[in-house]
């Protein structure tokens, strides 16, 4: 031992590395043990793979072998018969004694074949008695002896441990430090490190022993649970008596119910309610059987489904009173979800539809009067011409809408550029048509067409009731509408009732509620005729956006 010159509080020790031929191994036990408590002699051994290989080879040849382990080294006693050839053709067997070192005896077998004079090349009968040996086509994989666990046990078998090698020893080194009397350290390199853990041995039991063992376990568990119940019971009397009394009371109640049922004289009679319950499923079965008779599998052409097309091809309105009531109920349900502005818009659309219906009715009445007061006449050729031309004439009489084509296939701009001669030709056509319309047959056909058109309009109006957000497109910039606006905007305080002003309001505010926009144009909207115009202008300029459950109008 020598003190360090750098720091007086530190001590330095000299380490002397021992270089020798001895190999030291370290055994580490997982728990504290006392080797003196082991019953002697103590035995430590491991499985020998080499001996197993030799046993397998010897078994193939029918040769027994034994192996023993002494002084941490392997030694084998191989009992192998040696075959020596005798001069008279007979074989004799013998054994070689074991020596202190591992010895391996080699055996040589010779067979003599004798041939008779009359049978050259005859087989030897002794060769048939020898066992057939199959040649090995592969070799066993080499086994690392370090990976084979050690087994440590005493003579009585009370202490048994199994030791496995520690980790990957190819990348680690172990040293044993031994302090010497002169203050130096002797470092001894260690070969292997083994961790020893106690080996658990499971006791095998028969079926009867296992049943007895489980009964004892159940009894112990019952005792344990009863003690816990006594501790948890506040009265301290224990829960066993209460449980037994509860079980007895339940059993008594069940017995009383059985007695009442058995003693009841009407137990086999059925009541009216039970009869009704039994008859109900029988009636259902009868109805199902009747429905599945001759026409039970026939398709139902009258039933309607959600994905069916509209009844536009049917004569008349195509809707019954029940259908109209159902539509009204649906409208009432939709009204609950609409805001105040939406309800006002819906009312305006309904008024416009009613006006259109009233105008159609007046036109029908006029046609009837003309039919009653008109004179007979007209040829079949005129009727045929009337059937061919009405579509074109109707299209030519439609109001001029921007971007739409006329019956001739020309746009409004092209119509304006036509010569006066074209206008004169159109006027002559109209005069001819009036002459044809004066005949009673043509009037009857027109009345029928007007009725069919009114029925289609009614259907469309009922569809519009379901979809209030899609009003009829009315162009506000027509000359008649502009004249109405000029007449209505007499009050100087009211804002101009134009599409441009609505666009300016939307651009300034960016998003407006429908009620706020209606309040701005409150004066012009007092006139009911302005409401559909206002709807059309808003539809052309703005679109609806929903934010956080609130609907706003924003410019397009």
From Swiss-Prot:
**Family annotation (InterPro entries):** TFIIF-alpha, TFIIF_interaction
Q: Give the SUPFAM superfamilies listed for this entry.
A: Rap30/74 interaction domains
Instruction: Report biased composition (Low complexity) as residue ranges.
Output: 84-128, 469-492
Which Pfam families does this entry report, sorted A to Z?
Answer: TFIIF_alpha
Segments of skewed composition (Basic and acidic residues): 245-275, 415-427, 450-461
GO BP terms, alphabetized: negative regulation of protein binding; positive regulation of transcription by RNA polymerase II; positive regulation of transcription elongation by RNA polymerase II; transcription initiation at RNA polymerase II promoter
Would the keyword Transcription turn up in this protein's UniProt record? yes
Q: Where is this region: Disordered?
A: 82-128, 226-499
> Which species is this UniProt entry from?
Dictyostelium discoideum (Social amoeba)
Question: Where does the record say this protein resides?
Answer: Nucleus
Q: Please give one Gene Ontology molecular function term for this protein.
A: RNA polymerase II general transcription initiation factor activity
Q: What name has this protein been given in UniProt?
A: General transcription factor IIF subunit 1
Q: What is one GO cellular-component annotation here?
A: transcription factor TFIIF complex
Per UniProt, the ranges with Acidic residues bias are: 291-338, 378-394
- Kindly state the subunit structure of this protein: Heterodimer of an alpha and a beta subunit.
The similarity annotation says: Belongs to the TFIIF alpha subunit family.
Q: What does this protein do?
A: TFIIF is a general transcription initiation factor that binds to RNA polymerase II and helps to recruit it to the initiation complex in collaboration with TFIIB. It promotes transcription elongation.
């Amino acid at each position: 031992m020598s003190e360090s010159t750098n720091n007086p509080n530190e001590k330095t020790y000299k380490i002397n590395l021992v270089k020798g031929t001895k190999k030291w191994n370290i055994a580490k036990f997982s728990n504290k043990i006392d080797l003196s408590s082991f019953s002697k002699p103590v035995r430590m051994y491991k499985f020998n793979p080499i001996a197993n290989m030799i046993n397998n080879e010897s078994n193939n040849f029918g040769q027994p072998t034994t192996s023993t382990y002494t002084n941490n080294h392997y030694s084998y006693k191989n009992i192998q018969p040696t075959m020596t050839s005798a001069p008279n053709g007979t074989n004799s067997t013998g054994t070689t004694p074991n020596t202190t070192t591992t010895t391996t005896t080699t055996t040589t077998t010779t067979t003599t074949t004798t041939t008779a004079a009359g049978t050259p090349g005859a087989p030897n009968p002794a060769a048939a008695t020898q066992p057939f040996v199959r040649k090995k086509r592969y070799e066993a994989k080499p086994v690392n002896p370090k990976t084979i666990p050690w087994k440590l046990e005493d003579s009585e078998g009370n202490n048994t441990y199994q030791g496995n090698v520690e980790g990957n020893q190819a990348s680690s080194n172990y040293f044993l430090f031994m302090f010497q009397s002169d203050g130096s350290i002797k470092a001894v390199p260690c070969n292997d490190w083994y961790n020893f853990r106690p080996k658990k041995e499971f006791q095998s039991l028969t079926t009867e022993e296992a049943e007895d063992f489980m009964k004892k376990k159940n009894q112990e568990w019952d005792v344990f649970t009863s003690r816990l119940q006594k501790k948890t019971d506040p009265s301290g009397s224990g829960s066993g008596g209460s449980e037994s009394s509860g079980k007895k009371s339940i059993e008594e109640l069940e017995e009383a119910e059985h007695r009442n049922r058995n003693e009841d004289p009407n137990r086999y009679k059925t009541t009216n309610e039970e009869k009704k319950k039994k008859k109900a499923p029988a009636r259902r079965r009868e109805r199902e059987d009747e429905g599945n008779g001759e026409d039970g599998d026939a398709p139902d052409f009258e039933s309607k489904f959600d994905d069916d097309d509209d009844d536009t091809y049917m004569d008349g309105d195509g809707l019954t009173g029940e259908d109209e009531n159902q539509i009204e109920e649906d409208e009432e349900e939709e009204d609950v979800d609409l805001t105040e502005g939406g309800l006002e818009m819906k009312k305006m659309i309904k008024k416009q539809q009613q006006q259109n219906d009233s105008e159609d009715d007046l036109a029908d009445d006029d046609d009837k009067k003309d039919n009653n007061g008109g004179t007979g006449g007209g040829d079949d050729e005129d009727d045929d011409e009337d059937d061919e031309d009405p579509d074109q004439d109707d299209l030519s009489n439609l109001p001029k809408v921007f971007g739409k084509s006329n019956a001739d296939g020309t746009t409004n701009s092209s119509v304006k550029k036509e010569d006066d001669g074209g206008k004169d030709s159109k006027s002559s056509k109209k005069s001819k048509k009036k002459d044809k319309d004066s005949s009673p047959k043509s009037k009857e056909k027109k009345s029928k067409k007007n009725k069919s058109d009114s029925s289609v309009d009614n259907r469309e109006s009922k569809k519009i009731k379901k979809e209030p957000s899609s009003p009829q497109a009315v162009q506000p910039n027509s000359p008649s509408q502009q004249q109405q606006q000029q007449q209505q905007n007499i009050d100087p305080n009211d804002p101009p009732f134009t599409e441009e002003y609505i666009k300016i309001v939307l651009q300034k505010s960016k998003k407006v509620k429908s009620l706020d926009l209606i309040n701005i144009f409150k004066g012009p909207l007092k006139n009911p005729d302005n409401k559909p115009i206002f709807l059309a202008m808003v539809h052309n300029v703005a679109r609806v956006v929903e934010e956080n459950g609130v609907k706003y109008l924003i410019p397009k």
